[in-house]
Amino acid sequence: MSAADPIQDNKSWTVADSAALYGLDHWGHPYFSANANGHVQVQPRGDQGSCLDLVELVEELKSRNLNLPLLIRFDDILEDRLERLHSAFEEAISKYGYAGRYQGVFPVKCNQQRHVVEQLVESGRQWHFGLEAGSKAELLIALSLVNDPEALLICNGYKDQRYIETAILARRLGRQPVVVIEQPDEVERIIRSSQELGAAPFLGVRAKLTTRSTGHWSSSVGEKAKFGLSVPDLLATVEALRQADLLSDLRLLHFHIGSQINDIAVLKDALQEAAQIYVELTKLGAPMGYLDVGGGLGVDYDGSRSASAASTNYSLQNYANDVVATVRECCKPHGITLPILVSESGRAIASHFSILVFDVLGTGTVPGAIPKQTVEEPLTIHNLRETLSGVMATQKGAVSEISRLQEAWNDAIKFKEDALAAFRLGYISLPERALAEQLTGACAEAIMGQLPCNETIPDDLQSLRAVLASTYYANLSIFRSAPDTWAIEQLFPLMPIHRLNEEPTQLGHFADLTCDSDGKLDRFIGNGQTKTLLELHNLRQNEAYMIGMFLAGAYQEVMGNLHNLFGSTNAVHIRLTTAGGYQVDHVVRGNTNSEVLEAMEHNPELLLERLRLASELAIQRGELKINDVRRLMDHLEASLRQTTYLQG
């Protein structure tokens, strides 16, 4: 069946079947589900509030000249994530009788977009929610936006003299920056800056924990971790601060064991180790007061609630309970004041709030049609036809026939290889080579259709799924919109956002617009395991096929690059209205071709002028007519004003 053929509806297929197939009810809860129309719907306030039909929303945004690919940010989801985080800690503090409070910060590196950071600061004001900065530019953002004197500004990363002095002086602006010492050589600069300015800093230290972590971010802990002080370094830092009369300004202990903690047991071990270090620091004379447990509050990308790389074996409430209970258990026997608990939970806050919607431009499929037999055909072609006839005569679904089907597929592969060898030697023509490929595809399709259900299938026949898979050409750049899928093999939920009341009859993967073989999406979630093919629908003429990438609101936008000069996509901020509708709060236009050219130091006007002059010469030579030149220049000028992606 060709990918362009009209689909034959399976009347028994339901929306619930699609939701189960794509795991929507697991990773999507409580924000995403499927409605009776077979569309993905969004509940921006989770279990409360109204729903938005995602397909209808996209169509209305397209009518506003916001073409795909389109990044849709739901501000209500961002606020809801913040509320759920604080509610979880408030419940845990109440449950365990913790004589302290929780005060979070958002790591700006997760998503530096202005509207995102501004909204988090404003929405978090009631909890004195702050920001974490890891560079001078991020520090500038944090200092300018957070004007709450009780909110924390955690200053991480490498720090030169100017960074340190900026943080110290900002205290006089009514800000509360915490300079976290992460490298031994920062101590001397901090002491010198404090003495020269005559101002006391608010200090923290980051400890290198020995707790063993798992997954991609396991290098965040241990002796070879990029950041943090070893125990000897911690002791040396305390002594240096004591000698400089700055030990009274050491108020915070920070640790970080990875951006995504999959296993709650790892967190418990880290908390026990960090809490003991905290206790020891108080014994050494530091007043302390804050324990920053870092990031790592994970996202269940595949919905399996397991310790796999794309999941977490705990809930948000489990996480808060373990942080509160473990710190209380470790600190209370020593009679010290329980610390204010801080977390840098950027991934858990930002992942859910944005959806990338892109369209499919076309498909590439294995030729499966059976070509008509010609009078004289090479032996390799004849052998393939005989193999196909044998498969067609096999009893469908018979377990006893599996070995015959396996033999037939091995024969088909061998005969195809014979045909390719004959072509290289000039014994068969190009049309005959094409015939061999078509017959091999027909064999694969026929064998796949004869395999029995619910039986163990040999590995060689399992590979038929990949052989028959289609390539769906996506109107996006993964290097711009989902770089982690390429860089660290991150899994994000992908699924059609419509036609969920139809059974998907194709298996496929996605290829992006870039001229790069790595520009593909070929790893998908599936029942707690990774699969290389996704169930998709046939394309229909004159009808867009729209795919959603979910849970990608953290890191992807800020880490994307200009590979092949594909720039940022159009983006919108959506907010629910009291009447149950929505309003577009902000529109962020995607990069135009002119903008990405300028980013690479090209002058668009100069490029146009060169082409105009070349066109004039072509007119003089009689190679172009004036009307053709006008059309060419119109196209070029329009392209400079358009986004870098293909237009429908």
Curated annotation (Swiss-Prot):
PROSITE patterns: ODR_DC_2_1, ODR_DC_2_2
GO molecular function, one term: arginine decarboxylase activity
Pfam families for this protein: Arg_decarb_HB, Arg_decarbox_C, Orn_Arg_deC_N
Domain of life per record: Bacteria
SUPFAM superfamilies noted in UniProt: Alanine racemase C-terminal domain-like, PLP-binding barrel
Cofactor: Mg(2+); pyridoxal 5'-phosphate
Binding-site residues for substrate, renumbered to this chain: L291, D292, V293, G294, G295, G296, L297, G298, V299, D300, Y301
Keywords in alphabetical order: Decarboxylase, Lyase, Magnesium, Metal-binding, Polyamine biosynthesis, Pyridoxal phosphate, Spermidine biosynthesis
InterPro entries for this protein: Ala_racemase/Decarboxylase_C (IPR009006), Arg_decarb_HB (IPR040634), Arg_decarbox_C (IPR041128), Arg_decrbxlase (IPR002985), De-COase2_CS (IPR022657), De-COase2_N (IPR022644), De-COase2_pyr-phos_BS (IPR022653), Orn/DAP/Arg_de-COase (IPR000183)
Sites of N6-(pyridoxal phosphate)lysine modification: K109
This enzyme's EC code(s): 4.1.1.19
Disulfide topology: none
GO biological process terms on file: arginine catabolic process; spermidine biosynthetic process
Chemical reaction(s) catalysed: L-arginine + H(+) = agmatine + CO2
Function description: Catalyzes the biosynthesis of agmatine from arginine.
Family: Belongs to the Orn/Lys/Arg decarboxylase class-II family. SpeA subfamily.
Name of the protein in its database record: Biosynthetic arginine decarboxylase
Name of encoding gene: speA
